Amino acid sequence: MNRLTTAYRPLQGILQQLQWGDGLAPLLLRLYLAPVMLQAGWNKLSHFEETVAWFGNPEWGLGLPLPELMAALAAGTEFFGGLLLLIGLAVRWISIPLMITMLVAALSVHLDNGWLAIADPSSWLANERVMESAERLARARALLQAHGHYDWLTGRGSLVILNNGIEFAATYFVMLLSLFFTGAGRFTSVDYWLARRTGLGVHTPSA
């Protein structure tokens, strides 16, 4: 144990010297999430009537109660949440409704489709739905190879089937959860400079 402690101390000292850069990870998380949330929110706001119909219709939509309110909350949370993430303002607070939005999306929209966003029968996370998609994809390829410009169609990437599982929603939730605990990050966020100005949270690694 003494040898382990002796070896640990200098290594920990090196890590402590790197603490000045501990705001980099929160910054990159924010820059990754901000355009995703902004785009999702803007799509809902710019097609608000269609969004409300999808939220409320029980046959081909989500069948949620109070669809106007739910659509407005989801769209506003994503769009304005994306703006706050971008500038690093109230990041820990806005992470909460954004996480709730991701949970609602995962449970009400994506859960029945399993984990995978893109159907990949070779994945060990593939469910029965994904395995069945392999035959559909093979038939689609055969039709396009026989009757379409297959080389041109696949010139920018392979044909895939969207499975629409919880993969993206769960990933965004984990990233937001990290921001909830770490904050917006040192030096590159409005939160950090507000904390310094007010004397609140200045002793934490990330504001």
Model-predicted regions and their roles:
Residues 52-66:
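Perimembrane loop-to-helix junctions flanking transmembrane segments
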Residues 1-49, 65-76, 80, 87-207:
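Extended, low-polarity transmembrane helix blocks
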